[in-house]
């Protein structure tokens, strides 16, 4: 919706090897409802309708919300909670600003970054499991490019790094070298 900047429809169509998954979320903001439908492989389609709040959004919009926040307003330790709409549930996502740091990004160089610790809570409450945090480093400039994500797993951790960028809206002032 161009007036409110709220999502009207979210679709996902995943094909990875032999795995397929399709989902669609249709938002009705005046009624504060979202109708979801999803299908794995050739199994029957599932549907569910759920209530929304002002801080409910799909994963892509949630990430955009985090990137569009004014970095000057962040205070170390400050936390915000949003709600992430998934196919059959709404999860609470808490993110906390950890501070600014210089971060070396593999094959990209050094950057001034904004570091966030994130946790996904249960759908029933704001219950967050200790030790389940994952971390996101965004470029400390107007672009707020996601540079690195680190998430612990049972043995070790998963790391994702940016491998390139182009067509940035603003100059990349966070790059040191």
Model-identified regions with their sequence ranges:
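Acidic, serine/threonine-rich low-complexity disordered tracts
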Residues: 1-29, 72-177
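Hydrophobic, well-structured mid-protein blocks that either form specific transmembrane helices
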Residues: 23-69
